């Protein structure tokens, strides 16, 4: 994974307070690119927060601050919203403002149903993962405490320290796609609860949505990438400096790059003036936003590691790998920890040839060697068309998994069929309909097992896909 180019890691190279230091045009370009990439996840997350919450009522993945928005069913076959849609779990999303006091997130007893509530700060790493893996299915209360809060945690609550003012919960609750199961999940979603700590448990607490801002400063419908490009270099760095001031202070491990950024005048709480760097440098940085996005696009193509023909990406935790964090923000915002979910995918068969619906393919799990998970696994079929999308088909079937009552072979192995036309009624339980053109299957493995065989340590890998002559 490519690291930030030109970053001087020597601690103690702090810039003097105030004006930017004298640097050459080339030095300024290098530092500016580093700074832009460093802040990309923060600015992306903040733009996304505003777009998702600047509404007067909950509707799907949009809801006012302090309220859950719940998705009630899988996306339809013709969905073209967010690439690589999910047909295994229903989303529940909520943002909270911890600036005045902590908030409490509560969920009911989930029984043996798989669920996951990854929690993110504004920089986009997973800071906690309440759910089946970490806490089991019993009802629970989580105290979300913002920076500097020193109060007493009430009995029966689990504290989650949040290093930024705002916090996101992007929950997933398993659903099998039937109307009966949707109703059961929707009933659980209705019990996902948020309240300020001062109002927790008070029967007279009534949620009141914040007013909608009619002039938020940018489009509420454009993709965050486009919104950020529209900020320009000066606007972007000013937004970054403002966010780092109070809402999202940089982590201690970021001190080296913060010192570098100060050399061109990008500092928390201080206005950034591009012209102060001189006309030559200002001209050289004019196209920085597009250049940075191009850089992230190139890194997206090489971020995953290929194993046995399948591509894996280790995301969710980033440390000082600012490029990886920015790539995920740009093209896969946000992401789970591998311990919670792994999503290997492939675009080629065992001979390295691109997968296409013009051919027929099989994937066979040897007896006892299906994906090793504590949660569940499934394989989703996507057609490739400026994104990854469901494949409309007569069965309205977008995934194949054990919930299809897979039919084993005589030796106990399980063969799955990836093709455009039905392999026959007797094989349709194991069939994942493919488009006529290019496609990719993605395996979703929730709560993968840690002991071997495990996808986490590479002792288990998905079998390769075989073209059928």
Task: Give names to the regions the model predicted.
Residues 1-22:
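Gram-negative bacterial Sec-dependent N-terminal signal peptides
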Residues 20-469:
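A compositional/structural signature for long, glycine/proline-rich flexible linkers
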């Amino acid at each position: 994974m490519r690291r930030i180019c030109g970053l001087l890691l020597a601690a103690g190279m702090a810039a003097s307070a105030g004006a930017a230091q004298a640097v050459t045009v080339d030095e300024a370009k290098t530092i500016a690119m580093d700074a832009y990439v460093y802040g990309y996840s923060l600015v992306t997350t903040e733009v996304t927060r505003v777009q998702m919450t600047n509404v007067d009522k909950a509707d799907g993945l949009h809801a006012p601050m302090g309220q859950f928005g719940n998705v009630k069913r899988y996306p339809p076959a013709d969905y073209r919203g967010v690439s690589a849609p999910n047909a295994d779990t229903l989303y529940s999303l909520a943002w909270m403002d911890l600036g005045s006091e902590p908030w409490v997130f509560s969920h009911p007893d989930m029984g043996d149903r798989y669920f996951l509530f990854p929690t993110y700060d504004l920089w986009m790493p997973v800071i906690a993962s309440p759910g089946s893996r970490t806490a089991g299915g019993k009802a629970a209360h989580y105290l979300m405490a913002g920076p500097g809060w020193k109060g007493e945690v009430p009995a029966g609550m689990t504290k989650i320290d949040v290093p930024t003012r705002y916090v996101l919960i992007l929950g997933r609750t398993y659903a099998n796609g039937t109307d009966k199961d949707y109703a059961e999940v929707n009933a659980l979603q209705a019990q996902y609860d948020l309240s300020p700590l001062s109002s927790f448990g008070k029967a007279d607490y009534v949620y009141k949505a914040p007013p909608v801002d009619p002039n938020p400063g940018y489009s509420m419908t454009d993709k965050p990438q486009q919104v950020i490009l529209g900020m320009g270099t000066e606007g972007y760095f000013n937004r970054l400096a403002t966010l780092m001031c109070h809402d999202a202070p940089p982590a201690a491990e970021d001190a080296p790059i913060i010192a570098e950024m100060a050399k061109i005048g990008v500092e928390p709480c201080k206005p950034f003036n591009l012209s102060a760097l001189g006309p030559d440098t200002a001209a050289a940085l004019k196209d920085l936003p597009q250049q940075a996005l191009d850089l992230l696009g190139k890194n997206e193509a090489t971020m995953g590691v290929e194993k046995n023909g399948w591509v894996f990406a280790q995301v969710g935790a980033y440390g000082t790998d600012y490029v990886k964090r920015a790539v995920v923000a740009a093209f896969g915002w946000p992401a789970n920890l591998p311990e919670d979910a792994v999503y290997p995918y492939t675009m080629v068969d065992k001979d390295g040839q691109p997968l296409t619906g013009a051919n027929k393919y099989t994937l066979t799990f040897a007896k006892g060697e299906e994906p090793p998970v504590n949660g569940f696994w499934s394989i989703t079929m996507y057609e490739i068309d400026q994104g990854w999308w469901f494949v409309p088909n007569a069965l309205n079937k977008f995934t194949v998994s054990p919930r299809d009552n897979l039919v084993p072979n005589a030796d106990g192995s399980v063969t799955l069929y990836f093709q455009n036309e039905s392999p026959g009624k007797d094989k349709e339980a194991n069939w994942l309909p493919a488009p006529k053109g290019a496609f990719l299957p993605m395996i979703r493995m929730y709560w993968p097992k840690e002991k071997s065989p495990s996808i986490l340590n590479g002792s288990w890998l998905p079998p390769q896909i075989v073209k059928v002559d």
